[in-house]
């Protein structure tokens, strides 16, 4: 009888992938990045083991949103104090902290537990074209579709 393969955390091989977000649609990019962070593209994927790769995203400031989402989409955060609910539109967030928009979208697509937090730590988002991970020799990854 054959047994199902279960990867061990010590045996997982991780790559560094570089993705250029220039001109890409937010949702299409983030769903594929979430899949890469989880390791679902690998034949050795195991749900309870972090088998994902490190993902570097550059040019986050040049991401595209379809329709009128730039003005209509609202991001909320709360300070924890009474009356501490803050809100800003996608346009304002893109102007101030463009990498935050990608991080929030990807974080929502990962598991909500310690494994998801571990996978999220392998995401590195930069607003411009420069990044500080040249020593890791990242491979350029082309998105499907």
UniProtKB/Swiss-Prot annotation:
CDD domains: Ribosomal_L13. GO terms for biological process: negative regulation of translation; translation. Keywords: Ribonucleoprotein, Ribosomal protein. GO terms for cellular component: cytosolic large ribosomal subunit. It comes from the Bacteria. The keyword Iron does not apply. One of its GO terms (molecular function) is structural constituent of ribosome. Part of the 50S ribosomal subunit. This protein is one of the early assembly proteins of the 50S ribosomal subunit, although it is not seen to bind rRNA by itself. It is important during the early stages of 50S assembly. NCBIfam families: rplM_bact. Belongs to the universal ribosomal protein uL13 family. This is Large ribosomal subunit protein uL13. The lineage of its organism: Bacteria, Bacillati, Bacillota, Bacilli, Bacillales. The gene is rplM.
